[in-house]
Amino acid sequence: MSENQQALNHVVSMEDLTVDQVMKLIKRGIEFKNGAQLPYEDHPIVSNLFFEDSTRTHKSFEVAEIKLGLERLDFDVKTSSVNKGETLYDTILTLSALGVDVCVIRHPEVDYYRELIASPTITTSIINGGDGSGQHPSQSLLDLMTIYEEFGHFEGLKVAIAGDLDHSRVAKSNMQILKRLGAELFFAGPEEWRSQEFADYGKFVTIDEIIDQVDVMMFLRVQHERHDSGAVFSKEDYHAQHGLTQERYDRLKETAILMHPAPINRDVEIADHLVEAPKSRIVQQMTNGVFVRMAILESVLASRNAN
């Protein structure tokens, strides 16, 4: 086991991870990116259960599992007993009884995992692939890995998170850990989508007030599927008021980087031609997702082997 590895029973929330655990996962992800290998001779079994649509999280977990040599047990929500009314608890109870070691789960219910990890009967480890508008720890960790590769530290970095704050599990995961790591946080976006909980972690600003000062400019997707009513803004108005235009991009510091968890609404959060601009690290984020998820899986499986 690498000295950068630290065992975890579950990975469900950034609030539950210590700074030491976070840094070890980031550094282990970088080791995997640089070619470290860890073949499993006992063939642990992982099942991915996605109750919400996903491309990057779902597929990068699959690639991570393949690279680690794990056995993957396919789970298709549409053809499972979920459609007969089976609860999430009973689904995971079944997979645990079948001997599945790890379940990667995305679910629309915030904190769905609490009941699962509290159960004395369920022995499978849980990795949260996103719970509604709650937490998204693996996305946060890949974001941190991307920032760390760029700057080599977090202390004193100015990080702005802009967009649909209230509905973003990415924003909530990142604000908690970035503050603990010593970054200075700023939040921008429509006032209708930013609750007071963000004020405990940083300062509310407009994007034009902060764009030329930040080291990291992170945009968030407008999550139409989580809004109770129709669009508050037209796409054009939102982009003009809150998105990354060419003029705003030109105001970024020479050393600043642009991030977005994706999927991207092009010409809404970010102008289409800027998604792959020189300061963009969006593709690198996707790449890093595979390696940090390898580190997460390795750490969870190490915990199981130690018990």
From Swiss-Prot:
Gene3D superfamilies linked: Aspartate/ornithine carbamoyltransferase
GO MF annotations in UniProt: amino acid binding; aspartate carbamoyltransferase activity
Pathway: Pyrimidine metabolism; UMP biosynthesis via de novo pathway; (S)-dihydroorotate from bicarbonate: step 2/3
Gene Ontology CC entries for this record: cytosol
Recorded superkingdom: Bacteria
GO biological process, one term: 'de novo' pyrimidine nucleobase biosynthetic process
Chain positions recorded as carbamoyl phosphate binding sites: 56-57, 106, 136, 139, 262-263
EC number: 2.1.3.2
Catalytic activity: carbamoyl phosphate + L-aspartate = N-carbamoyl-L-aspartate + phosphate + H(+)
One of the Pfam families matching this protein, by short name: OTCace_N
Transmembrane segments: none
Function of the protein: Catalyzes the condensation of carbamoyl phosphate and aspartate to form carbamoyl aspartate and inorganic phosphate, the committed step in the de novo pyrimidine nucleotide biosynthesis pathway.
Official protein name in the record: Aspartate carbamoyltransferase catalytic subunit
Source organism (scientific name): Streptococcus pneumoniae (strain 70585)
